Structure formats: C-alpha cells, structure tokens
C-alpha cells in the first residue's frame, strides 16, 4: 500500500506579492523552503486562511532572507497581499515508512517571521 503523507508545511505565512501576469507558481523565500523541506519546482497545495480558497501550483525560490511569498499567474486570483496562507507539500511512501514519518512544519507570525519548527502537527484538544 502507498500512502500520501504531509512532507512539509509553512503555517500562516503572509502574502507579500500577487502578480497575475507572472508565468505562474509561488515564489517563496529560500530560507522558508529549507525550513519545510520543500524543493524548488516541487508541487505544493496552498490553503488561504482568509478566503477559504484551496489551489495547487509549484514552488520557486525567492531571494534568501527576503520573507517573500508571491502568488503568481492565475493563482494570484486566489490570494491578495496580506492574506495568510498554509503551504503544504506531500510525499508518497510505503505504509511501513509512513508509520515512521514526521513532516517538517514551520510556523510563522507577523511579517513572515519564523517562530518555530516542528516535526509534527499538535494534537487538537477538545
């Protein structure tokens, strides 16, 4: 059996740019990509916390240290500057590997300041 698992997650990053006429993708600060283990050109799913939009694209690297999150091309219709996003990548693996797997999660606040990194999503309490 093959399972699809969360590989990396950027939690609550803020959109800094939206460029409808760029050829596509989502530009992400290289430091952020590394924090979540996301590779340039890797497929990503984006969840807009502010408007509920969910869409797929691919990651490209933005300048290291820039704190840029730029939603480009047609996806720019799904997010505005200032919107909070959750950006995820996924990996497929065997059932046995999935049971040992831990994602790389990076949490952000304010103007895209990395607050902490984790290897799991916290258990939701009642």
Swiss-Prot record:
Catalyzed chemical reaction(s): L-aspartate + H(+) = beta-alanine + CO2
Residues with Pyruvic acid (Ser) modification: 25
Active site: 25, 58
Alphabetized SUPFAM superfamilies for the sequence: ADC-like
Protein name (Swiss-Prot/TrEMBL): Aspartate 1-decarboxylase
Encoding gene, per UniProt annotation: panD
Pathway(s) where this gene product acts: Cofactor biosynthesis; (R)-pantothenate biosynthesis; beta-alanine from L-aspartate: step 1/1
Localisation: Cytoplasm
